[in-house]
Amino acid sequence: MEILFFGSKGPITKLLQKTLNRIGYNAGEADGIFGEQTYEAVIQFQQSNQIPPTGIVWPQTWDALAPALLGYSKYTVQAGDTLFKIAEENDISVRALTAANPGVQPDSLEIGTVLTVPSDRSVIDWDIEYCYDIMYLNLRALKIRYPFIEIFSAGRSAMNQEIYGARLGRGDINVLYNASHH
């Protein structure tokens, strides 16, 4: 992800603003312009997450924002937990919870097991201009919700960016959807 700072503009800045607002840090209107209110929200987020409060969104800040950006949280199984209870407390379906945690046995949850809890919001944020970085975040978010998806490199573009593919299953029939755009 690109490094953002006071004065940055564009879809990644808008995504940052929407994410900060969603998790309780008032970045103001999500207009794609990194102004004073966004700067203050970034400082507050950094302080809350033991990151040096520079107001610059650099890799350490992006890493701390990853669960909110990608739409998941982690939950450690406690005594008395069931998948139904965990799903209900997080306002998601048991199906979504089991899809994100293949191999977890619903009838015998082990205390201390760390589960991925997907959020109920859409992976795609429809009111942000689509760009390469957002496409990559969307692929990562899908992989978290559906670990069976295989993300792979199909090569590099003329602009030297990775061209990603996603395999959703295996079988006798192969279907290719091309979503390239310039």
Where are the predicted features?
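Acidic, Ser/Thr/Pro/Gly-enriched interdomain connector segments
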Residues: 1-32, 68, 75-78
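LysM (lysin motif) carbohydrate-binding repeats in extracellular/periplasmic proteins that recognize
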Residues: 18-29, 33-52, 78-111
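Short, conserved phosphate/pyrophosphate- and ester-handling motifs at nucleotide-, phospho-/glycolipid
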Residues: 35, 58, 160
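Alpha-helical interaction/regulatory segments in DNA maintenance proteins
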Residues: 53-69
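M14 metallocarboxypeptidase catalytic domain recognition
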Residues: 69-80, 84-106, 110-182
